[in-house]
């Protein structure tokens, strides 16, 4: 029977992580469990930085961005001996289960603890990239989307004033959800998504045609890692003549107070994670699909499941611009 659980956040931070921690802590306490916080992710676990949490430990955190537990990337966790020590540390505290909030790398860590040591782990999807399989939305995505749209709105004001072409680089790694949705909401004229490839010549020709038809400014939304946006800006300006500037939104997308959607999603998922542990589940990851909370085998989710590309959204965008 589970009596003690721990919670950690790992990888890149995302708005709503604090709400998820709060939900795990308070749901666990309401069920009579002891709840512990692991500081700075798997690195903190390896360094035995674990602290018992109370109801008041998570007061006034639901509206705060980031994660008060801290987060860190810890590549050493790939080493079997490091994972073994982490499992020993959890057992030394009498901890029976672990809730991991993070992205795919965090899930992999939870998967290995479950596979190798039989340690009950539940994964919650916390990343602005919305690239975790088994869920329609990840914690932090909606807030990051609002941040990106706000930036696009501001860039449109100044781009229109100066007849400028603006390139906006948006996070997401190999998933274009954030880029496509921000572009639709922000009225961007062009979208460059990694799933469909990038043809620079085709993009420039489209811009040239738009300018020839009377367009005086434009905004291009592009997912990070597709190309060097500053070089692209120079290439476009050299061809079309209009001043062209690239803006990399970067880590500003990870910050800020989480929106209501992310607070509610994180709260629901956190409570659900505790319920799953009490039901005897382990090695599961939580998601939301068609507005219903679901759970999947964490190993299957990482190895087999794939997130669908929003091709229908991209087709919508083509008819709007």
Swiss-Prot record:
Pfam families, per this entry? PFK
The UniProt note on how this protein's activity is regulated states: Allosterically activated by ADP and other diphosphonucleosides, and allosterically inhibited by phosphoenolpyruvate.
Which InterPro entries does the UniProt entry name for this protein?
ATP_PFK, ATP_PFK_prok-type, PFKA_ATP_prok, Phosphofructokinase_CS, Phosphofructokinase_dom, PKF_sf
Q: Indicate the enzyme's highest-level EC class.
A: transferase
The reaction(s) annotated as catalysed by this protein in its Swiss-Prot or TrEMBL entry are: beta-D-fructose 6-phosphate + ATP = beta-D-fructose 1,6-bisphosphate + ADP + H(+)
Q: What is its EC number?
A: 2.7.1.11
Q: Where does substrate bind?
A: 127-129, 164, 171-173, 224, 245, 251-254
Alphabetically sorted, this entry's keywords are: Allosteric enzyme, ATP-binding, Cytoplasm, Glycolysis, Kinase, Magnesium, Metal-binding, Nucleotide-binding, Transferase
Family designation: Belongs to the phosphofructokinase type A (PFKA) family. ATP-dependent PFK group I subfamily. Prokaryotic clade 'B1' sub-subfamily.
- Name the record gives this protein: ATP-dependent 6-phosphofructokinase
